[in-house]
Design a protein with these regions (language model features):
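Conserved NTP/Mg2+-binding pocket subregion across the NTase superfamily
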Residues: 69-189
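Ligand-binding pocket scaffold of soluble enzyme catalytic domains
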Residues: 42-44, 57-59, 87, 193, ...
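Conserved nucleotidyltransferase catalytic core and NTase-mimicking acidic/glycine-rich helix/loop elements
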Residues: 133-296
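N-terminal regions immediately upstream of nucleotidyltransferase
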Residues: 1-17
């Protein structure tokens, strides 16, 4: 059984009935789910994934003010739940967020995932949070949300990035694609540095993946799952087999084809109107679309 399915069943068959019986007043005030890092939250877990971190459990989220009055009671209830569910051991060492499962405040969850106690409020905060952290915070599923607060938090993280921040990151990855792939792969080879050329190609692939997620207005997950998630993107997912081939054997013509496809999408989104084949001038054209003068003043390579 996949982790999300197991967690949902644990909530529906063990946790929610216990709360209804013991403290039903909490149901409208809490959220329950499984979200954050891990292949299970992305739906990518399999039998091999069960060799670590596989347990029956769920997360219970309270607002900070509710945690002060109800957190201990809810944690005690959670710790009294069965030690095994559907033949899978449960994790109980989770009082007040000490562990993956159990009771957490919404602020604790945000701090664990993004480094902030709140959703990002400024462009600087959005720039500082890595894509994989935002992806993890949005991954998984909320099974119940009495107040709607966790749903709102995750929706803000999913869709709330300011457009100027997205555009700035696109510009940065565009110039880094140009530098690593269109310029340095061939240059390293002319120097006889094949290992350096392959490393440059890996950089190109990594920045291209980041670009694809940004062009789709999605957050790129941790590198281990980036390719699999990229295959599900609505736009440019057809490039993924080509990027996989580049990792096996760097090829300059293939790099140019990938770059051309990205340039075409940049034009389609109104981010550039230039006719260049090289990505670098397009990156500067993208920078000129930024309206916030502070963001526009950042170094072009900053992502």
């Amino acid at each position: 059984m996949k982790g999300l399915e197991l967690s949902r069943a644990f909530w529906e068959d063990a946790v929610r009935p216990a709360i209804r019986e013991t403290c039903p007043v909490l149901l409208p005030r809490l959220a329950a789910g499984l979200c954050g890092g891990g292949s299970d939250c992305l739906g990518y877990d399999d039998e091999l994934s069960h060799d670590h971190g596989y347990a029956a459990g769920c997360m219970l989220f309270l607002a900070p003010e509710d945690a002060e009055t109800h957190g201990f009671l809810l944690s005690a209830l959670y710790d009294r739940l069965p030690r095994e569910f559907l033949g899978v051991k449960t994790e109980h060492r989770s009082r007040q967020g000490n562990g993956r499962y159990g009771v957490k405040t919404t602020g604790q969850f945000l701090l664990e995932q993004t480094g902030l106690f709140h959703t990002p409020e400024t462009w600087r905060e959005w720039m500082a949070i890595p894509s994989y952290a935002l992806a993890a915070a949005c991954a998984g599923e909320i099974f119940h949300d009495g107040s709607g607060s966790m749903t709102g938090i995750r929706e803000t993280l999913r869709t709330g990035m300011p457009e100027d921040v997205r555009v700035k990151k696109i510009a940065g990855h565009a110039v880094l694609m140009a530098q690593s792939g269109q310029y340095n792969v061939s240059r390293c080879r002319r120097h006889g540095e094949e290992a350096a050329a392959r490393l440059a190609c890996c950089e190109f692939v990594n920045h291209t993946l980041a670009m694809l997620f940004l062009l789709n207005e999605r957050h790129m997950p941790f590198y281990k799952w980036a390719f699999r998630a990229a295959k599900e993107l609505p736009k440019l997912s057809e490039l993924i087999p080509t990027l996989e081939a580049l990792l096996r054997e760097p090829d300059e013509d293939t790099i140019e084809r990938v770059s051309a496809a990205v340039i075409e999408e940049l034009r389609a989104q109104g981010l550039t109107d230039g006719g260049w084949d090289f990505l670098e001038p397009h990156a500067y054209a993208v920078m000129r679309r930024i309206r916030n003068p502070e963001i526009a003043a950042l170094h072009i390579m900053e992502v």
